[in-house]
Amino acid sequence: MKNILFATSEAVPFIKTGGLADVAGSLPKYFDKRYFDIRVILPKYACMKQEWKDKMNYITHFYMDLGYKNCYVGIMHMEYEGIQFYFIDNEYYFSGPKPYDGGTWDLEKFAFFSKAVLSVLPVIGFRPDIIHCHDWQRSEE
């Protein structure tokens, strides 16, 4: 069994600004579950619809250093269409009215997300053989 983690800044049906969400939210369900354990991780944005946030289960939280900051990292979970989705919670970075703000703020936000993704893996007990980093927001990893 191969373990694959899709790390993305958006995925349907939870949050969508463009085609990235379609790929990251749809592709995982087409892998043969006999051979692949596919999981998806993305930010828990404040601008997500409340109906999705209400279905998430809190797993745990911890604090992680990012430069001079000690940052809260919450881990939420939901199964959707047979796929395990994890959501990184941090109100400081993900409380805006939309997923992307533009400019340098997005660089810091997704640097945090990139480090949080790697820090979450031992906590959730998932050891991916492949981490599929989607789009520029994941390129810091």
What are these model-derived regions, one by one?
Residues M1-E141:
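Catalytic cores of nucleotide-sugar-dependent glycosyltransferases that transfer UDP/GDP/TDP-activated
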